[in-house]
């Protein structure tokens, strides 16, 4: 189950790399390693997520309950270890997803292995935020976080373009460590913590951080088709939360899938009626003119479709978004 996708991914990566280059060799070694873990279905993801949750709760009990017996401690420690094993399994089963997404950003000045490393940080963040009770497939949920991590890594690198060569490596190293520590600590690391982790003298930390804040164009195109500017991926205080952004993207995907089960005319009427393509809803009269139908016939089609969407498998697929 794992070998075939890995061979396909390796083949696609080979087509983008010089077959004799050291980078190609490193990528092949990496892909061969991650291909040993089988891909997961939705049920497998949920089972692992439950074990991870149980491990975290057991760890919390060990840290906060002072009067636990030795047998209870041993049992909880076993649950913690099982949760950690489940976490590794979920991570390793999705590393190929990171490679697949990272490959779309090659050719923009950042080596593929660096893109993969940034994407792996996004995968770890997705694991921390994932809530299996909402019914989303983890790999679908993680895609948003992986893409965000990669585009942020690209932005960090672009800030260093005008720096002297001898500073670029240190700035990139510090930026990566800063992100890793933020994910581990759940807050921004202090200058002292950054210095201890990076081995860079504390009096140099501030200088490097200032260099890393050099401006970058928010109009820089990113994405597999260069369809969106970098600014679309940068968080701001007024933007919707990351969680809501993920849910909105998943909802949009599920709506498209549900509408695809309708016949062609029903599909087109609903897309136009609610402005799903361009955000501009059409009136019954406008849709009627497009299809050569009366206003009342368009209304009847809309009513029939909405009735279909309220019942059966279609409704089940969309109901979780209403909670």
UniProtKB/Swiss-Prot annotation:
Complex and partners: Monomer. Interacts transiently with the RNA polymerase catalytic core formed by RpoA, RpoB, RpoC and RpoZ (2 alpha, 1 beta, 1 beta' and 1 omega subunit) to form the RNA polymerase holoenzyme that can initiate transcription. Interacts with RbpA, probably 1:1.
Biological process terms in GO annotation: DNA-templated transcription initiation; positive regulation of DNA-templated transcription; response to heat; response to hypoxia; response to xenobiotic stimulus
Stated name of the protein: RNA polymerase sigma factor SigB
An example Gene Ontology CC term for this record: plasma membrane
Motif (Polymerase core binding): 114-117
Function: Sigma factors are initiation factors that promote the attachment of RNA polymerase to specific initiation sites and are then released. A non-essential principal sigma factor that responds to cell envelope stress and hypoxia. Controls a regulon of about 40 genes, with another 100 genes expression being altered during SDS stress and about 50 gene being altered during diamide (oxidative) stress.
Region (Sigma-70 factor domain-3): 169-245
Alphabetized SUPFAM superfamilies for the sequence: Sigma2 domain of RNA polymerase sigma factors (SSF88946), Sigma3 and sigma4 domains of RNA polymerase sigma factors (SSF88659)
Induction behaviour: Expressed in exponential phase, peaks at 10 days and decreases after up to 50 days in culture; induced by detergent (11-fold), heat shock (23-fold, 45 degrees Celsius), low aeration (2.5-fold) and oxidative stress (2.7-fold, SigE and SigH responsive). Seen to be induced and slightly repressed by 10 mM H(2)O(2). 2- to 6-fold induced by starvation. Its basal expression is largely under control of SigE, probably via MrpAB, although other factors including SigH also play a role. Half-life of about 2 minutes.
Range of residues in the leader sequence: none
Start and end residues of each stretch annotated as Sigma-70 factor domain-1: 25-59
Domain comment, as recorded: The sigma-70 factor domain-2 mediates sequence-specific interaction with the -10 element in promoter DNA, and plays an important role in melting the double-stranded DNA and the formation of the transcription bubble. The sigma-70 factor domain-2 mediates interaction with the RNA polymerase subunits RpoB and RpoC. The sigma-70 factor domain-4 contains a helix-turn-helix (H-T-H) motif that mediates interaction with the -35 element in promoter DNA. The domain also mediates interaction with the RNA polymerase subunit RpoA.
Region (Sigma-70 factor domain-4): 258-311
Encoding gene (name): sigB
UniProt entry tagged with the keyword Lipoprotein: no
Region: Sufficient to interact with RbpA, residue numbers: 1-228
Keywords recorded for this protein, A-Z: DNA-binding, Sigma factor, Stress response, Transcription, Transcription regulation
């Amino acid at each position: 189950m794992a070998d075939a996708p890995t061979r396909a991914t390796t083949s696609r990566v080979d087509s983008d790399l010089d077959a004799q280059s050291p980078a190609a060799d490193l990528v092949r070694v990496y892909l061969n390693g991650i291909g040993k873990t089988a891909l997961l279905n939705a049920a497998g993801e949920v089972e692992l997520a439950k074990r991870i949750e149980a491990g975290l709760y057991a760890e919390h009990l060990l840290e906060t309950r002072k009067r636990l017996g030795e047998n209870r401690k041993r049992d909880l420690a076993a649950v913690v270890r099982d949760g950690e094993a489940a976490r590794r399994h979920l991570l390793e089963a999705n590393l190929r997803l990171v490679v697949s997404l990272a490959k779309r950003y090659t050719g923009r000045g950042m080596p593929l292995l660096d893109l993969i490393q940034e994407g792996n940080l996004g995968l770890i963040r997705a694991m921390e935020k994932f809530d299996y009770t909402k019914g989303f497939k983890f790999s679908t949920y993680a895609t948003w976080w992986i893409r965000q991590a990669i585009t942020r890594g690209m932005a960090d690198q672009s800030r260093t373009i005008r720096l002297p060569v001898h500073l670029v490596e240190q700035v990139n190293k510090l930026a990566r460590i800063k992100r890793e520590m933020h994910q581990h600590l759940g807050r921004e690391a202090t200058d002292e913590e950054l210095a201890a982790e990076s081995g860079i003298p504390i009096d140099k930390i501030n200088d490097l951080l200032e260099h890393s804040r050099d401006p970058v164009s928010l109009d820089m195109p990113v994405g597999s088709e260069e369809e969106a500017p970098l600014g679309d991926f940068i968080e701001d205080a007024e933007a919707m939360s990351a969680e809501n952004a993920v849910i909105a993207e998943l909802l949009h995907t599920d709506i498209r899938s549900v509408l695809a089960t309708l016949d062609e005319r029903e599909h087109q009427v609903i897309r136009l009626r609610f402005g799903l393509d361009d955000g501009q809803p059409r009136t019954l009269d406008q849709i009627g003119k497009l299809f050569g139908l009366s206003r009342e016939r368009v209304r009847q089609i809309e009513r029939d479709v909405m009735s279909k969407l309220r019942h059966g498998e279609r409704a089940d697929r969309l109901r979780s978004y209403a909670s």
